[in-house]
């Protein structure tokens, strides 16, 4: 195979930035080792070239549903640095092959901590795909280690973007979709409701009610959930099922979320760990109590973000609670654990409704240890009582 044309790019909100010679000696952001972009890009290139591109061609064959061999030439490869985090330095890999284009995500771990997490994530993604066969997480295509880096080539969710809470000129909270290449899109509360609903549903679908395993950690500030909007200008689907206004949909008013699944679609980009949230002993706790604590944590953690993804910790509006409850219940009703034993679902709903407001507030206390030493904790502390009241109201009215 002839060597394909390979181009290095850096993603930005305004479009791709071609990498010039002067940029190659700049250090990666968020990297304590100060790895130069030159080493980063060249190591990625070496990883992709392994075994004369054969693993990469096999991955392209699976994505394009056509068998490619070493005789088929990759005419061009675009290696695009997408973002930089404390654990990984993700890139996207775009191939031009036989006149067709295919795109992958590539997680790159540089530090010892990042490499430990990525090794675990590779194994976990494979397990979750095997167990649940759901489309919400990226599928592993190639993984390996080279030049002291750990690599994971996985699905790229094309057309999906990060979202974050921000403040307008009047310091009013709003949600924005970060559409890299075209800028930022302001979202309505109705659209935000749908995003939180789907994110909550995804996490619940992957929850293991028998072993109490849960995908965590994740955080909106890290961009772990991403969103695709097919028709950004579409209005809410009228009417809501029971009155209510379109600015801030709630379960109490019977609002369904307002936007169809075809308009907004959510995916989860990572599964770093999969284990019980708290130190539950399987033979010593009722599985429904473990599920109860998953539910509490879901309602709480769904509200946390950082302003513009990097600023101060921010607390999402109340509609996020109703959205989390709706997404949780939708997923719960579809799980075999409850379908095979319908009485379990009713028993769990009775359990939720049995808590008084004061009991519900106290029940959050064990979860606070999860946030010890984080900037999330003070924000949770300031808002927890009102959050419990909102959740209690949603439980009593909706369930």
What are the functions of these language-model segments?
Residues 110-138, 146-147, 190-194:
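A conserved alpha-helical element in kinase catalytic cores
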Residues 242-244, 253-254:
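Glycine-biased, low-complexity coil/linker segments
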Residues 1-76:
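Juxta-kinase regulatory segment immediately upstream of eukaryotic protein kinase catalytic domains
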Residues 214-232, 261-323, 327:
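Catalytic activation segment of kinase domains across protein kinase-like and atypical kinase folds
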Residues 1-15, 19, 306-399:
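Helical subdomain adjoining the active site within ATP-dependent kinase catalytic cores
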Residues 183-218:
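Conserved kinase catalytic-core segment
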Residues 139-194:
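Conserved structural core of kinase catalytic domains
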Residues 77-127:
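ATP-binding glycine-rich loop module of kinase domains
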């Amino acid at each position: 195979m002839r060597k394909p044309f390979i181009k290095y790019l850096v993603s930005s909100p305004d479009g791709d930035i071609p990498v010039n010679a002067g940029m190659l000696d700049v250090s990666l952001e968020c990297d304590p080792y100060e790895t130069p972009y030159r080493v980063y890009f060249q190591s990625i290139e070496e990883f992709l070239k392994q075994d004369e591109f054969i693993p990469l061609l096999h991955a392209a064959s699976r994505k394009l549903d056509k068998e490619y061999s070493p005789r088929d030439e990759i005419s061009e490869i675009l290696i695009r640095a997408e973002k930089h985090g404390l654990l990984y330095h993700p890139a996207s890999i775009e191939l031009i092959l036989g006149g067709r284009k295919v795109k992958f995500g590539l997680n790159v771990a540089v530090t010892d901590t990042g490499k430990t997490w990525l090794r675990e994530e590779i194994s976990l993604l494979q397990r979750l795909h095997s167990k649940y066969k759901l489309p919400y997480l990226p599928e592993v295509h190639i993984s390996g280690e080279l030049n002291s880096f750990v690599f994971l080539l996985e699905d790229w969710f094309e057309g999906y973007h990060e979202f974050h809470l921000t403040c307008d000129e009047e310091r009013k909270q709003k949600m924005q979709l970060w559409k890299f290449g075209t800028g930022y899109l302001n979202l309505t509360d109705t659209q935000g409701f749908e995003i939180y609903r789907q994110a909550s549903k995804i996490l619940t679908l992957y929850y293991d009610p028998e072993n109490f395993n849960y995908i965590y950690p994740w955080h909106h500030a890290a961009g772990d959930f991403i969103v695709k909007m097919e028709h950004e200008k579409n209005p809410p689907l009228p009417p809501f099922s029971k009155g209510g206004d379109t600015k801030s949909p709630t379960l109490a008013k019977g609002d369904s979320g307002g936007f169809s699944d075809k308009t907004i679609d959510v995916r989860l980009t990572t599964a770093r760990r999969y284990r019980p949230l708290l130190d539950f002993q399987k033979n010593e706790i009722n599985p429904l109590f473990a599920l109860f604590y998953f539910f509490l944590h879901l309602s709480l953690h769904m509200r946390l973000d950082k302003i513009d993804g990097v600023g101060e910790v921010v607390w999402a509006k109340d509609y996020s609670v109703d959205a989390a409850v709706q997404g949780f219940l939708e997923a719960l009703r579809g799980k075999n654990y409850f379908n095979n034993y319908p009485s379990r679902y009713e028993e769990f709903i009775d359990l939720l409704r049995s808590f008084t407001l004061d009991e519900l507030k106290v029940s959050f206390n064990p979860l606070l240890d999860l946030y010890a030493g984080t900037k999330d904790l003070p924000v949770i502390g300031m808002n927890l009582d009102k959050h419990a009241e909102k959740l209690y109201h949603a439980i009593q009215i909706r369930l």
